[in-house]
Amino acid sequence: MTEPLCLTPGGLSLDVLRRIHREAPPLTLDPRSYAAMAASQAVVAAIAGGESAVYGINTGFGKLAHKRIAPADLEALQTNLILSHATGMGAPIADATVRLILAIKAASLAVGASGIRAEIVDALLALANADVLPVIPSKGSVGASGDLAPLAHLCCALLGIGSVRHKGAVLPAGEGLAIAGLSPITLRAKEGLALINGTQVSTALALAGLFEIERAFAAAILAGALSVEAVMGSHRPFDPRISALRGQFGQIDVAALFRLLLDGSPLNAAHQGPSCERVQDPYSLRCQPQVMGAVLDQMRFAARTLTIEANGVTDNPLVLVDTGEVLSGGNFHAEPVAMAADQLAIAASEIGALSERRIAMLIDSTISGLPPFLVAEPGLNSGFMIAHVTAAALASENKSLAHPASVDSLPTSANQEDHVSMATFAARRLGDIAANVTGIVGIELLAAAQGLEFHRPLRSSQTLETAMAMIRERVPSYRVDRYFAPDLEAIAHLIGEGRFDALVPVDLSTLGSV
């Protein structure tokens, strides 16, 4: 059984978030959180029973904030809010991401600045632990005021409304609650608003994209090293003195990864003597530390921004227990998430763009020195000709997907919400970009492995030969033309499973090694 994970509000590390997404451990809440939640809920209860009008507690919402709501209608107000805001469309968000949404929403509410009862936070974790996951449509949020529509669908499940997924089957929410040992919840003052106001959906989607890109990045470093060996490229561009003179942290770390992978290669030793004519390789080989280092820098920036956001309170209004104040602000505006996701999208697209160029180099015998299209009898066999076309198609698609979403904004709610972040789309499309990059890098892994085999009996480094064995365990050598699609799918699965992660240790928790 997976080891349980205790959520500490404000203390969710990137490793913890990654573990929730990939391993689905049982979740518990730090017991110290309960006093903070009770104190903030008491502040809200006092206001709800008083005479003062306070936004989100006894008023309408958005453009209707000036409407005062009678005490007898406060529960109906919260229920109406959820029902009216559950307007999402599109394919459901993936289960692993929904589980992450539940976890970071619970942790945010448990800080004790939202005025919500602890039993609702416990219910969110109970759903995750029972694998009863709200069906949340992926479209319908503009990333301010929070992820209203998708989080309303999440909240509907707590009310016994809508649908949930359990062990892959879609069930009515009421049945799902029973499986989780829960009953439909009646929301009190501010609780519905606290549940739907926040950036947890866009943050979880962006984190999910980051975790997929992280694996594609590791595989791309490996593929790039294999390509260097396949075309008998130079190892000199990875000399630490080159990167040190520039000083870019990501470049320094990526160059070190290449040295780790290439060190001790007999193949390289066989051709890197005084007679070697390899003076300068194409940029797609020689500039890998520079390009992939810049990508790594952006991944680290995104990781830091998203970790901060996952630990933040993005509700509105906020309950300050120490003073009894309820402050209206704009923490729900997901601009940090949108910009981080946009930069990550551009960076991930560059992984694929560079990999596609190396595939083109490998199949071009005039550059690579390998047989045309990496097949022994070209002409009779087409080899990797159209696999490269697929890579080019995916790389080109990513160029469109990488267009920044955060530069767009449409006013909503009768111009009350007159600038929005588009963070949810910015984050959601990362999954498509990551899938495309994984496909491209997978093709390069197969092409580079094929190219390397033309140099047998010479062998590469121990690490790269380990990678070769892993590849060939799933996909045999390409001798003559065969039905190719299953091979591409198999290598993409190998990347997605993280099988290459241990060979390419990538640390996103730091800004650099120096």
Curated annotation (Swiss-Prot):
> Which EC class heads this enzyme's classification?
lyase
InterPro entries to which the protein is assigned, alphabetical: Aromatic_Lyase, Fumarase/histidase_N, HutH, L-Aspartase-like
Q: What is a single cellular component term in the Gene Ontology annotation?
A: cytoplasm
Q: Which UniProt keyword terms apply here?
A: Cytoplasm, Histidine metabolism, Lyase
Task: Quote the catalytic activity from the record.
Answer: L-histidine = trans-urocanate + NH4(+)
Gene from which this protein is expressed: hutH
Modification(s) after translation = Contains an active site 4-methylidene-imidazol-5-one (MIO), which is formed autocatalytically by cyclization and dehydration of residues Ala-Ser-Gly.
Where in or outside the cell it occurs: the entry states:
Cytoplasm
What's the protein here called?
Answer: Histidine ammonia-lyase
Question: Its Gene Ontology molecular function terms?
Answer: histidine ammonia-lyase activity
Organism of derivation: Rhodospirillum rubrum (strain ATCC 11170 / ATH 1.1.1 / DSM 467 / LMG 4362 / NCIMB 8255 / S1)
| 2,3-didehydroalanine (Ser) sites (modified residues) | S145
Alphabetical GO biological process terms = L-histidine catabolic process to glutamate and formamide; L-histidine catabolic process to glutamate and formate
Its EC number is 4.3.1.3
Known pathway: Amino-acid degradation; L-histidine degradation into L-glutamate; N-formimidoyl-L-glutamate from L-histidine: step 1/3
Q: 5-imidazolinone (Ala-Gly) crosslink - at what positions?
A: A144-G146
Gene3D superfamilies assigned to the protein according to its UniProt record, in alphabetical order: Fumarase/aspartase (Central domain), Fumarase/aspartase (N-terminal domain)
- This protein's source sits in the domain of life called Bacteria
Name the family the entry cites: Belongs to the PAL/histidase family.
Name any one Pfam family assigned in the record.
Answer: Lyase_aromatic
